[in-house]
Amino acid sequence: MLAASLRSPGTLTLEKRPIPVLGPRDALLAVEATTLCGTDLRIATGQKTNGVTPGVVLGHEIAARVWRIGDELTAGVDVPAPGTQVGLAPEIACGQCNACVSGRSNVCARMRLFGTGVDGGLADFILVPQEALACITPVAREIAPPLLALAEPLSCCLRATRRLPIGPDSRVLVLGTGPIGLIHCALAAFAGARVMACGRAARLEPARTMGAETTTTSQGDGLVANVQEWTGGVGADVVIIAVGDPGLVPVAIQCARIGGHVSFFAGFPAGATAQVDPNLVHYRELTLSGSANATLDDYASAVDMLSTGSIDLSQLVTHEFALSDVSSALDAVRTRAGLKIAVRPDGMVGR
């Protein structure tokens, strides 16, 4: 099979390797699409090395089909039957640490991830070991594989929004109009909220299409003024920081209303710091919260939302590349040529 593996930090190699050997309690999936994110690019270029196993096959946003199951597994009981279209949650949690037993398996102390510590989706096939069978999530009805691959980023956004008071007529400010910010716009609009998106001019039209009623490129005091005007001087009920810029933190806090919530969704550079006015947090009684990864329940909900058509993210996938041209796919991510870039096994592009 063809696979894109990390030979060493910054060296991504496209190679032919044997199809993984199926153990008695493993499952083998045929990959149908893997969408890329900034993390994949940082790993491929050597900027991210923590938690990355040398030689690992990259790709953690995965849509696939069950190909074979081990002799000791029962189809439809232990794992979906061969031929079933599935999403694959990337988080393999231990189930035993304090985080796992308290319901936060998304921040498991011994987390392993498909695409960083375990071979991921930039290959023709992916082996799912026994301890990760619960990550295999069948669809309610079949959908385009690149769309199904978006269940992973959707599940992470869903994890955050489930912890925020977003409902009908809530005012939600989304900072950042990359794919993650756009998904947050769609989720907030789905919940009935009114959404303002702030980001680069080129991404404002997609933000409007995905649920933002108003958009802005303003920064700093200009953004605060925009939010005040939009909310009648009250401020946003919820502010979601969807891009890893520490400079947005003080502005986000200024934009929140009394009793408002600020979600630190984006990951920030290692060692990053932000200056916060503690009196704003104190006197406005603000709630600041973080969110990372997703639980299996979040992922299952995301697959269900996509496969039932409850939420439409189809416009996010703007480019498809064959696996044999994965270097061009990563270049498209680097140059921001589109929104989400999908990589598919050779012969499947456009199908």
Where are these regions (language model features)?
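Short amphipathic alpha-helix with an adjacent loop that forms part of the alpha/beta core around
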Residues: 222-232
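Glycine-rich beta-strand-centered segment in the early N-terminal region that forms part
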Residues: 20-34, 48-98, 140
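N-terminal glycine-rich cofactor-binding segment
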Residues: 3-21, 38-69, 87, 102-117
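Short, well-ordered loop/turn sites that connect or cap secondary structure elements
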Residues: 77-80, 166, 256
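Glycine-rich phosphate-binding loop and adjacent beta-alpha segment
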Residues: 245-308, 345-351
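Mid-domain Rossmann-like dinucleotide-binding core that forms the NAD(H)/NADP(H) cofactor-binding site
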Residues: 141-220
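NAD(P)H dinucleotide-binding glycine-rich loop of Rossmann-like/cofactor-binding domains
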Residues: 94-175
